[in-house]
Amino acid sequence: MLDLIDLKILRTLQAQGRARLADIAEQVALSAPAVMERVKKLEVNGVIKGYTALVDGKTVGKDVTAFIGVSIGNQRDLDRFAAQMLNYADVLECHHVTGDESFILKVKARNTGALEKLLGEIRSVEGVTRTITKVVLSTAKESQVLELDDNLTEGHARRK
């Protein structure tokens, strides 16, 4: 279960992924080894899923962001489709959703030509009956930071 110190550690790591353990320890009034032990526990328990650098796509030649709604005609093709999306580097996210589409994909492509090629490949996946694409013109907010409510502490355990 998470306690208030765990939440403080998580907030710090979300804001500053490269924060030094000694700095975090000072913020939460623990020793660096105690903070390291807590971070390891958060990793082992799957609370912290990993560490990554957030790269601006435009600076590395990924100029087009799009969301693609994908309809799958048959229930038995859902898992196969999701598994195949793991093979596409330009597909950043693949979510099984409710509504008219079966999946929503977030993609970043080099240009519209690369997006068109990717769409063709996605449409050729067995079971795909339709795609709807929304190209992003501008982004007002894009974040990976989760708000962590203090009610997640003991006595208010999260449900899986």
Task: Tell what function each PLM region has.
Residues 1-160:
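A compositional/biophysical signature of low hydrophobicity enriched in polar/charged and small residues
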